[in-house]
Amino acid sequence: MAGNDWINSYLEAILDVGPGLDDAKSSLLLRERGRFSPTRYFVEEVITGFDETDLHRSWVKAQATRSPQERNTRLENMCWRIWNLARQKKQLEGEAAQRMAKRRLERERGRREATADMSEDLSEGEKGDIVSDVSAHGDSTRSRLPRISSVDAMETWISQQKGKKLYIVLISIHGLIRGENMELGRDSDTGGQVKYVVELARALGSMPGVYRVDLLTRQVSAPDVDWSYGEPTEMLTPRNSDDFMDDMGESSGAYIIRIPFGPKDKYIAKELLWPHIPEFVDGALNHIIRMSNVLGEQIGGGKPVWPVAIHGHYADAGDSAALLSGALNVPMLFTGHSLGRDKLEQLLKQARLSRDEINATYKIMRRIEAEELSLDASEIVITSTRQEIEEQWRLYDGFDPVLERKLRARIKRNVSCYGKFMPRMAIIPPGMEFHHIVPQDGDMDGETEGNEDNPASPDPPIWSEIMRFFTNPRKPVILALARPDPKKNITTLVKAFGECRPLRELANLTLIMGNRDGIDEMSSTSASVLLSVLKLIDKYDLYGQVAYPKHHKQSDVPEIYRLAAKTKGVFINPAFIEPFGLTLIEAAAHGLPIVATKNGGPVDIHRVLDNGLLVDPHDQQSIADALLKLVAGKQLWARCRQNGLKNIHLFSWPEHCKTYLSRIAGCKPRHPQWQRTDDGGETSESDSPGDSLRDIQDISLNLKFSLDGEKSGASGNDDSLDSEGNVADRKSRLENAVLAWSKGVLKDTRKSGSTDKVDQNTGAAKFPALRRRKHIFVISVDCDSTTGLLDATKKICEAVEKERTEGSIGFILSTSMTISEIHSFLVSGHLSPSDFDAFICNSGSDLYYSTLNSEDGPFVVDFYYHSHIEYRWGGEGLRKTLVRWASQVTDKKAESGEKVLTPAEQLSTNYCYAFSVQKPGMTPPVKELRKVLRIQALRCHVIYCQNGSRVNVIPVLASRSQALRYLYLRWGVELSKMVVFVGESGDTDYEGLLGGVHKTVILKGICSSSSNQIHANRSYPLSDVMPIDSPNIVQTPEDCTTSDIRSSLEQLGLLKV
């Protein structure tokens, strides 16, 4: 295309075009006035909205040649590429709009159905009192809870906490975490979150009423990181060690506990940690149980002191905290820090990667599912700002602000929520350590070039490093501290400064844009931002008025703030959107007024501190006017400074921790139920039948239920309206039904003659035997038929016949079948219940033990397990929703009245609602059902099993893998002594059986067809969570034999060769 030099001119003009035109009809006006410019049109209509730094980089490459013809060809190609990008962007925007519309319709439909279930008329209560009631989304820094506003208030609060001795567990598993000399910025995983969790742990450990805080993270012993990250334990020294030392005990204080998991000699990115989460959970569970027993000896009168809460930070730790919360039955808290759905939306808008590429790079779908599970399991979700709730959390299926408001109104009026739950959103801004901050006092007009009155205290070196840029260093400093990222909007700040002459005459501009050596060594994005800044400095001739030092240390940052305050300057954060804005709090603590973006967290900070002005980050003139107003107005500057210093204590760590502990105090206490009674069998090593019978009686006679609804009796609702008499009657009926059924099974078993095979070595003391086994073999093979399961079971038993006869190996059968189906299965295979120590039934919602001591039957149900997993169980409300969903699926997809799936009453139990699937191909994927239930605030674990022929819905924190952790907690059966046998695929809970500290044997050739059915439409690929090259996992050869299984066990070091 001849004459393409004109493209060069308008591409050059891109650098001067703002982020968008205020007048959408500007091009039409130009045409009407007869001054239409194709250059202007191209820039306005096609390029506007793209990142100008990227376009500039492409332009530089395109015009970097002396040959006019070659340059024209390059520019022509670039022109068409930009045009194509514009079309792709429009397409992506359309797809995004469709996604949002679909999500909105799904949410509105779910909200209508959820509201219809709650028949009582609470229209006034559901609307809420905006003035007097707590916000529907959580509490801001000025909520109804009393704040620390004076020393007296703090002392009063401290006196109220004196008698408490709380144990709190925090989890943050990625990055490099240590208490001192944190390597912030070393990589993308070691950033602000690391600093936040360390300071939170340290501050909580110093609070009255808190005995111990454990921050659990990953132990890293890689050669390319410091040795300190491999230390198992590190104590966090309190900053104010003299305040609460009187109450310190032997194991009290705050500690970093490093749990070994994942590759032992590698430091890996957080995206690669997902397959190793179960291993971390097992290691963390071991530590918490051990520490709870230690604290019990010190402060609990011999009874374990369980954590009052487990707090996960970021999605990976949230997933871990949910599993630990379920395993221990203690409350969970969650802080997202950065949310996956928001990141996914941003990446899709950038149009640089497809959805599949995004997931491959960031494992984003696994991360989103972990965040959804965190919403399911959390009592409280802690956020920094209201923006995080209103614009980020509302993207999730598991959180709906409108439905949350309705549920809260019902709870306040003590009306049943029909099994629906929504976590409490609490806005608690991060705290800050003020021990190193000394705000400037007195007259601020002193010299800045040195401290002549006190030569013993020279100015910090960073001051001279900044001052050398200025021709007049006495002018007030406008300070911006941000990395060179397009989102931080630094170029607009420089333009605002450069085009406002009064501002240039009154002030200097200091840009602290990270650390750099050479521009060529920076990332492409950072280099582009820096080059744009340098070009603007040259364009506006700002030499001598703008400082941009290359290096600074973390310890220099307070001195930089002090310099700006000393010169009566202003701190500015002009980011397009700021999730929180910790630098604004730091600036206020040093006596600096602020100018900040009106998008995001700064709004909440400004509401509390009232120490500056908010601006539209897209409005260059607004930024310049706000800066000029503060720099020129001495009274306004002084008032903003005073307000900031007066209110900054609201962002201190003691204030944060006080609100934090108040939130925890509002959680309903939960901990292992059997700890409330004298359970002699739990830790006893006795082999006597009496010990066994005491355990059996303890299980049989202590029924722990929270009953809601006519079928389940287990909603977990705080607002249950059942009377004590009804609860007792229902317990009695349930116990009698279980015992009567078990007697019938015993009679049938005796008639069939299947009791001939009795383990003579275990004798009567079945439960102690479970704990004395050298190894426990867990058969979790999900076959398409009972014949396949029976064949696999017999092969496994025959492979270790000698060890089984000696009593060193015990067996657990873990399936999706009911106990009745298991009994029929055992009879058909001529097996005895006594061949197994325990039975995990209904995908992990029921736990039975075999026994020969009781005349009531061969199976004993563990009712304590029910109380352990009943958290947030939806009961009858959940069942009705599932029945309605099944009917809708049939109406939508079935032809000629055929049923797709139907409720299976005979397969359902109090904690498992089962559905028989007649048309597996027409059944929606498991992720769709999970979504439907989450939108309606129903928290449960949906499992497609038996190759898609059955759907089991069980409590949200129940599973077959969690049942194994319960056995460890309840009976002390070491997880490392367990061997789990699985097929090549299995039910949709298959992935949970693979990871962990237990050993896994994959039986090749078994369940190989299941993956084509129920794993085809997963939210994320199974490969994202499969531990690769784990020493704990072995595979047998295809069509494994008994000898193959034994060889695999020898390979794991479990059997002697």
Curated annotation (Swiss-Prot):
The UniProt similarity line reads: Belongs to the glycosyltransferase 1 family.
**Keyword list, A-Z:** Glycosyltransferase, Transferase
Which molecular function terms from Gene Ontology are attached?
sucrose-phosphate synthase activity
Q: In which pathway does it act?
A: Glycan biosynthesis; sucrose biosynthesis; sucrose from D-fructose 6-phosphate and UDP-alpha-D-glucose: step 1/2
TM segments?
A: none
Record text on activity regulation? Activity is regulated by phosphorylation and moderated by concentration of metabolites and light.
The annotated regions of Basic and acidic residues compositional bias extend over 103-115
Source organism of this protein record? Citrus unshiu
Q: Which residues form the signal peptide?
A: none
The organism that produces this protein has a lineage beginning with: Eukaryota, Viridiplantae, Streptophyta, Embryophyta, Tracheophyta
InterPro entries membership:
Glyco_trans_1, HAD_sf, SPP-like_dom, SPS, SPS_C, SPS_pln, Sucrose_synth_GT-B1
Compositional bias, Acidic residues, is annotated for: 442-452
- The EC number(s) given in the record are 2.4.1.14
What's the subunit arrangement here? Homodimer or homotetramer.
The protein's matches in PANTHER family, at most eight in alphabetical order, are given as:
SUCROSE-PHOSPHATE SYNTHASE 1, SUCROSE-PHOSPHATE SYNTHASE 3-RELATED
Name of the molecule in the record = Probable sucrose-phosphate synthase 1
Q: Does the keyword Metal-binding apply?
A: no
